Amino acid sequence: MSIVTKALNLVPMVVEQTSRGERAYDIYSRLLKERLIFLVGPIDDHMANVIVAQLLFLEADNPEKDISIYINSPGGVVTAGMAIYDTMQYIKPDVSTICVGQAASMGALLLASGAAGKRYALPNSRVMIHQPLGGFQGQATDIDIHAREILTLRSRLNEILAKHTGQSLETIARDTERDNFKSAVDAQAYGLVDHVLERRPEESIQPS
């Protein structure tokens, strides 16, 4: 049995009573009904497609109601992360982001790109920013092409972080030169999140 299959078998099921009897959901599908999306694990093309589809579905369902993305990710493929980022900016609903565990690399960029005033981190979560990583083998000309592409991506990622954090491009470039880890409080001070949540506000808990 593959690791993926084992992981899928561990997803809890939720059973609800309806007028037509019982209906079972996996926990993530049930939470999607509450407009909660989970971005968990490495960011790749498959994950990006799933997250983008969920965002577009929830926009179609109600374009006026906020969407929340819970992030616990070490980062991943830049282009996959940018697909999620562009969709978050494109759709009409505000997208709130919440860091649980860690938001590193592209995960940190997506955390910072939530709607202004609606970016959160839990108190013991960690955030890490750095420059994009890349490796390529081949002819010298091809290596040069890919090196220039990485520099282009780095410049664009720095622009996005500067836009959402309020830091200058020079500060972002300096601070992403190497892996730069931040606590939830430090991430708030830097502008990566707006609030550190100790407890959920009582008024935000709605009965199902």
From Swiss-Prot:
A cellular-component GO term for this protein: cytoplasm
EC numbers for this chain: 3.4.21.92
Cellular location(s): Cytoplasm
Main location (coarse class): cytoplasm
Residues of the active site: S105, H130
Cytoplasm is among the record's keywords: yes
PROSITE patterns, per the entry: CLP_PROTEASE_HIS, CLP_PROTEASE_SER
SUPFAM superfamilies: ClpP/crotonase
Record Gene3D superfamilies: 2-enoyl-CoA Hydratase, Chain A, domain 1
UniProt catalytic activity: Hydrolysis of proteins to small peptides in the presence of ATP and magnesium. alpha-casein is the usual test substrate. In the absence of ATP, only oligopeptides shorter than five residues are hydrolyzed (such as succinyl-Leu-Tyr-|-NHMec, and Leu-Tyr-Leu-|-Tyr-Trp, in which cleavage of the -Tyr-|-Leu- and -Tyr-|-Trp bonds also occurs)
Keywords: Cytoplasm, Hydrolase, Protease, Serine protease
A GO biological process held by the record: protein quality control for misfolded or incompletely synthesized proteins
InterPro entries found in the cross-reference section: ClpP, ClpP/crotonase-like_dom_sf, ClpP/TepA, ClpP_His_AS, ClpP_Ser_AS
Coiled coil ranges: none
GO MF, one example: ATPase binding
Highest taxon in the source lineage: Bacteria
Biological role: Cleaves peptides in various proteins in a process that requires ATP hydrolysis. Has a chymotrypsin-like activity. Plays a major role in the degradation of misfolded proteins.
HAMAP family reported for this sequence: ClpP (MF_00444)
Family statement: Belongs to the peptidase S14 family.
Subunit structure: Fourteen ClpP subunits assemble into 2 heptameric rings which stack back to back to give a disk-like structure with a central cavity, resembling the structure of eukaryotic proteasomes.
Record's protein name: ATP-dependent Clp protease proteolytic subunit
Organism this protein belongs to: Xanthomonas campestris pv. campestris (strain ATCC 33913 / DSM 3586 / NCPPB 528 / LMG 568 / P 25)
